[in-house]
Regions:
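C-terminal catalytic "cap/lid" subdomain
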Residues: 2-78, 82-110, 114-283
Length: 283
């Protein structure tokens, strides 16, 4: 998992990462009681603003639209019907962007909303337009805030009875963030969730340890993946898939706990916080 001494130059390697994709999971944005974690939200926005002021480019992939829609509607349980899920997404997405706009405006940063479906990656013309738009936004010093367009997408909202092996370009924001990184030619993927990283089993079980570094995503590593949470769609398996996409493209990925204050600063300093995934080849 972690060859001796391999982490010694991690800080030096990460210092050279100038374009980052940061993915915020629903359980980072939302509290356990289903309300918005505003303090944590604004803290992460401040960290991103510092990265921008230090000359780094940031693309932010943000979950949370459905969770925010559920909050607005007073729902405690995730809806089972597709139309209800999409209604939650429509309500929550505007709320999500309003919070981002308020936070980043106070910090002197400009943002843009980018909503994607799998067709944006399948269709060559739409894909070319997407790449051009992201490049233009970054060139203007704008932070693209990217989310799957849940209101119109029909293949990625998991519902009871869904076939487990449906062919998808992406089915969650974890994998989407990996695809965004490769197509935007970014250097580092930061997956922020409510867990400390990849564990060698159930984190609550005795003797289970946090894995600080992974140099190859083997079947053993995949076996450590846990299930999904209640509000979001992603789990450890989808994060490993995102890490696989990124590392096979020659980039770094890290899974870290977005509840930890200043975790982004620690990640960008190359600290061994969370679980780091090393590139399989040179970028």
């Amino acid at each position: 998992m972690s060859p001796s001494g391999k982490s010694k130059n991690l800080a030096e390697r990460i210092a050279g990462c100038r374009r980052l994709v940061i993915k915020l999971g629903t359980n980072v944005i939302m509290r356990d009681d289903g309300r918005v974690a505003l303090g944590r939200f604004y803290g992460i926005a401040e960290s991103i603003a510092k990265l921008r002021h230090d000359g780094r480019e940031v693309l932010l992939v943000s979950s949370g639209a459905i969770g925010l829609g559920m909050e607005r509607l007073g729902l405690k349980k995730r809806p089972a019907q597709l139309a209800d899920l999409q209604a939650c997404a429509a309500i929550g997405q505007s709320r999500l962007m309003s919070i981002y706009d308020d936070a980043f405006e106070k910090l002197g940063c400009r943002i843009a909303q980018v909503l994607l479906t799998e067709d944006d990656f399948r269709d060559p013309q739409r894909f070319a337009n997407l790449r051009g738009t992201l490049a233009s936004l970054l060139g203007m010093g704008v932070i693209p805030i990217i989310n799957e367009n849940d209101t119109v997408s029909t293949v990625e909202l998991d519902r009871p009875g869904d076939a487990p092996n449906r062919k998808r370009v992406f089915g969650d924001n974890d994998k989407l963030s990996g695809l965004v990184l490769t197509h935007a030619q970014a250097d580092l993927l930061v997956l922020l969730s409510d867990i400390d990283g990849l564990y060698s089993g159930d984190p609550q079980a005795p003797g289970v340890v946090l894995i600080p570094e992974v140099h190859e995503i083997t079947e053993e590593i995949r076996g450590y993946a846990q299930g999904k949470n209640g509000r979001g769609r992603g789990g450890m398996a989808t994060k490993l898939e995102a890490a696989r996409i990124v590392t096979e493209a020659g980039r770094f990925a890290v899974i870290a706990n977005g509840h930890i204050p200043h975790v982004l600063e620690r990640v960008c300093a190359g600290e061994l916080v969370g679980t780091w995934f090393w590139p399989r080849r040179s970028a």
